[in-house]
C-alpha cells in the first residue's frame, strides 16, 4: 500500500475515532422542574443517542434512546436537543429525586464508546435556571446585536 494512502487512512480513522465529547454537565431548577444540561462537542454529523439516568441505591433510567426508560419517569421527563446541547427536564422535582445524575452520549458509528459525565443533584443546593441560557448557547445573534449598536446609535435609531 502506498505510504501516502496509509497516512490518509490513519488520519481519517483518528478523526472519526473521537466524534463527540461531553464538555459540561450542569443542573438547575426551572420552576418546579429540574433541568440537566449536557453540553458536548460534536465533530460528526452522525445521529446522537443519549441516556439520562439517576443513581440512588441503584440506577434508574429516566429518558433514553439507548435503552428503555423506567415507567415512573415517562410522564415526568422529556429531553430536548439543540446544537451541542441535550437537556433533560424532570417535572415535579422533589427531594426524593436527589442523587447522581448521569448523561451518556454516543454518536452512531463512533467506535470509541460512550461519553459519560455525572453530577450530584441536591434540591436545596440547586441554583435557579437562567431562562436565556439556551439562547446564549448560540451567541451569534448576541454578537451581531452588540456590533450593530454603534451603527444604530449613529443613525439615532437607538438612544442609550
UniProtKB/Swiss-Prot annotation:
| Residues bearing the modification Pyrrolidone carboxylic acid | 20
PTM annotation: The N-terminus is blocked.
GO term, biological process aspect, one? negative regulation of T cell receptor signaling pathway
Name its cellular compartments.
Answer: Cell membrane
Q: Which GO terms describe its cellular component?
A: dendrite; external side of plasma membrane; growth cone; membrane raft; plasma membrane
Molecular function GO terms recorded: GPI anchor binding; GTPase activator activity; integrin binding
Query: Mainly resides where?
Result: membrane
Q: Provide the residue ranges of the propeptide in this protein.
A: 130-160
Tissue-level expression reads: Forebrain, cerebellum and tectum.
Q: Where is the signal peptide?
A: 1-19
Domain (Ig-like V-type): give its ranges: 20-120
Entry-linked SMART domains: IGv
What does the UniProt keyword field contain? Cell membrane, Disulfide bond, Glycoprotein, GPI-anchor, Immunoglobulin domain, Lipoprotein, Membrane, Pyrrolidone carboxylic acid, Signal
Which residues form each disulfide bond in the chain?
28-129, 38-103
Q: Where is the lipid attached (GPI-anchor amidated cysteine)?
A: 129
Among its keywords, does the record have Lipoprotein?
yes
Q: How does it sit in the membrane?
A: Lipid-anchor; GPI-anchor
Task: Give the record's glycosylation annotations as residue positions.
Answer: 42, 78, 118, 138
Function according to Swiss-Prot or TrEMBL: May play a role in cell-cell or cell-ligand interactions during synaptogenesis and other events in the brain.
Q: What is this protein called?
A: Thy-1 membrane glycoprotein
Source organism (scientific name) = Gallus gallus (Chicken)
Which gene is this protein's source? Answer: THY1
